[in-house]
Amino acid sequence: MQMPWLHGKISRERTEKILATTANGTFLIRESTNYPGDYTLCLSFDGKVEHYRIHLLENSHYTCDHEAVFPNLIQLVAHYKRDADGLCHELVSPVISENIKNHLENSNFDAKIVEFRKAGILVNRKDVKVGEIIGRGEFGDVFAGFFLGQKVAVKSLKNGITSDLLTEAKFMSQLNNVHLVALIGVVMDGTREVNILTEFMANGNLVDFLRSRGRYQLEKIQLIKFALNVADGMRYMEANRLVHRDLACRNILLDEAYCAKISDFGLAQSVDNPTTQSKSQFFPIKWTAVEALRSGVFTSQTDVWSFGVILWEIFSFARIPYPRILIQDVVRHIEQGYRMEPPEDCPVSISNIMTKTWDSNPENRPTFVQLCRMLEDIIAKKLY
């Protein structure tokens, strides 16, 4: 039977680093360094880590206090999950050991190979030629490359496979809209090295593009078209009951014809089948609707709020939102009614849309269908 909380021989110092910022009741069990054969139960509580020796008795049973005795560690953990019984807190959430993580990821890897092959997006490594690096990220680097003569972006993972990234690839494989960056294929083989191929976006991300040009090089009509491209991509997501959850200019890329496309679907999910939040999921406060930050529930209406922030970014030429407000104070300001002023020289028609997207009542915000119509109307009537 698997014991995901059993971490083997790790030091007290390493344990305290692992548990340092975890919630009360988070725990793991490690082999005792001072008493061979014994274990140590390590438990997070009020910002500290408590260490309890688990004694191995002569009858091969285990105990923390010589009163409650258990035939194995599994029953010991089950007992202290029901009742703290002398501990500082009952056991709540285990920290999964690296061995279990690796086992799960290897199983996931093999399953994904079968899944991607059936979907027709599994790519042979010999058909991919990798060129110069064009971007660096926390989880990997991005290279320019070619797949069967087609120019592509090749994402290479730094630390082997990650289930999060394979999940993102699966999500992207279901998308089909001109304003969403397209998945070309996934390279997975016996080497356990993973590459994800997407369409090549020659003009990079929208933040860098806007900052390098500025208001004197870009006409307002071009800015509005960027916004309409994004709204159209999100109209497709909305129609398919999908939410992006990380909509921001940094995740908007421009192709060779300066068409804006939404990228980075690492946090995206179905409204009907929401995923549980993993520890790697940190939502960007300045772009996320307050009700989503409070409840953890995301809808198309929360994406609409984020789209309003994108409008502000576009017409401020990629300034950081909520300037001069500390990030820890942003939510409080919004809940008290504060909204950003429109950027300098922003058309009234655009600032009116921003105001609608930031309505405190999600039901009063426009849909992406309505936003597309508004932007198309602004372009047609030259309301800029």
Predicted regions and their residues:
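Catalytic-loop of the protein kinase fold
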Residues: 238-255
